[in-house]
């Protein structure tokens, strides 16, 4: 698992953010899902491979999974975070959900087997055979695919768009019989109104939408929220946008206790840009110096005169002369 995936999963394990992601993406910011009603439940599922023994199983792991408990009702919410477009994603999500339902079903069957064995229930023949009581119910599973990559999502958004109905020559008939399985897709780079989010998910999504646009980032960082980020949000932004300088110099931009103890990304970004400009000017000066040395060599100036005119060391002149000789050989 890459550092980006680990970073995003850790970021979303926070119940406030997890609830905000669902509320902001699906309910226009309305607090339908409450953090205090969530219980972390991320886990792996054992899936038997075909043509292999029962002991040979493949582990499928949920990225982030939470139980939502509201009164006597239990729901299962899960997020699959994607940095790259996955053209198999609708099937993957359907499989994760199926594994979750199978897990619940096995637990019900085990419970009912004990009750039947202890003669605490009187099942019908059908109930005994399947070990599921007519009144048994499963908990609904809701899986969201969160795409936070740079490129537009050009993959399928439901099972329908992975099908080849025309291949059999009966496209219309096949499509009428087919039962779709929609995928719950949220693309960070398609978010235009982020006011529905009320945690630092908003700041992360905004920065992700400005990747590659320095002026856009500068304008965005005028928002005072970026002047007082939490350490985890700082690290998430630095990792997902591939800014190693922000991770290296993190402590440098931490505010004092009186200032709020947050991290000031606005100041950090401005300093990084200033450093880049300084490096660019220095590289420009070096390129200009190299060009002058080459011209003086071509005009047969002595090394002593070149050193005096350009204020460089003999080693620099030798390197320029050697580089020019290599070009002539090529």
Predicted regions and their residues:
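Elongated, amphipathic alpha-helical interaction scaffolds
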Residues: 1-330
């Amino acid at each position: 698992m890459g550092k980006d995936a680990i970073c995003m999963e850790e970021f979303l394990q926070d119940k406030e953010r997890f609830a905000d992601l669902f509320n902001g993406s699906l309910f226009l910011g309305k607090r339908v899902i409450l953090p205090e009603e969530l219980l972390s439940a991320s886990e792996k599922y054992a899936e038997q491979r075909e043509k292999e023994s029962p002991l040979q199983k493949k582990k499928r792991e949920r990225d982030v999974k939470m139980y939502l408990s509201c009164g006597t009702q239990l729901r299962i919410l899960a997020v699959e975070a994607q940095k790259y477009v996955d053209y198999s994603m609708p099937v993957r999500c359907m499989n994760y959900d199926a594994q979750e339902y199978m897990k619940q079903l096995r637990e019900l069957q085990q419970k009912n087997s004990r009750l039947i064995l202890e003669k605490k229930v009187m099942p019908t023949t059908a109930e005994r055979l399947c070990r599921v009581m007519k009144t048994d119910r499963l908990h609904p599973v809701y899986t969201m695919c969160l795409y936070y990559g740079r490129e537009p999502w050009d993959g399928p958004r439901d099972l329908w768009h992975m099908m080849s109905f025309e291949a059999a020559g009966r496209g219309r008939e096949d499509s009428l019989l087919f039962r779709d399985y929609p995928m719950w897709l949220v693309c960070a780079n398609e978010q235009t109104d982020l006011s529905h989010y009320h945690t630092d998910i908003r700041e992360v999504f905004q920065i992700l939408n400005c990747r590659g646009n320095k002026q856009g980032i500068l304008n965005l960082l005028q928002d005072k929220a970026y002047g007082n980020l939490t350490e985890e949000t700082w690290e998430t932004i630095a990792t997902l946008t591939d800014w190693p300088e922000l991770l290296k110099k993190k402590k440098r931009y931490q505010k004092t206790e009186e200032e709020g103890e947050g991290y000031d990304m606005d100041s950090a970004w401005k300093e990084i840009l200033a450093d880049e400009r300084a490096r660019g000017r220095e590289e420009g000066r070096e390129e200009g110096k190299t060009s002058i040395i080459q011209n003086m060599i071509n005009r047969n100036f002595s090394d002593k005169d070149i050193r005096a005119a350009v204020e460089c060391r003999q080693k620099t002149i030798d390197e320029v002369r050697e580089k020019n000789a290599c070009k002539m050989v090529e």
